[in-house]
Design a protein with these regions (language model features):
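Nucleotide-activated sugar donor-binding and catalytic core shared by glycosyltransferases
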Residues: 1-145
Length: 145
């Protein structure tokens, strides 16, 4: 089971992680909350400051980062983003996303970004940029419809 394997790997590198489907009460020392159900992720973007889009770990095209960006989340992603290369390129220009190359470098990146995001002004800036980016993309899409 891949989700339990990921959970074990994160716990092994010192990141206290929890699966959404475990239905356990979330504790303050949880570093990573894994939403492992289809269609529920969007319900959590407004509650978080940092999102890792796990669909980018497998070669199926990636996940759209715009919903997460619009809620002011800093976005971490894996190597497989073929369907959203241009979107990620744009987000990288705004410095609101980081590529995770391996599970081993995830711990340091997550800790670094959590410390960075403790500052409330950063989250407000990310939310503002996310709104701008999403609105710009919606405008571009409407031109073709």
């Amino acid at each position: 089971n891949r989700k339990n394997e990921i959970l074990d790997e994160l716990n092994n590198i010192g990141l206290n992680s929890q699966l959404h489907t475990s239905r356990k009460k979330l504790s303050k020392d949880t570093d990573i909350y894994i939403v492992d159900t289809y269609g529920d992720t969007k319900n959590f973007y407004s509650l978080s400051k940092l999102t890792f889009l796990g669909g980018s770990l497998i070669p199926h095209g990636g996940q759209n980062p715009l919903e997460s960006a619009r809620e002011g989340n800093y976005i971490l992603y894996g190597p497989h983003i073929d369907n959203f290369k241009e979107v990620y390129k744009m987000l990288e220009k705004f410095k609101i996303t980081t590529k995770i190359n391996s599970i081993k470098n995830m711990k340091s990146v997550v800790r670094q970004k959590i410390n960075f995001l403790q500052r409330n002004t950063v989250n407000k800036k990310l939310k503002y940029l996310g709104d701008k980016i999403l609105n710009k993309n919606l405008y571009e899409i409407k031109k073709f419809i």
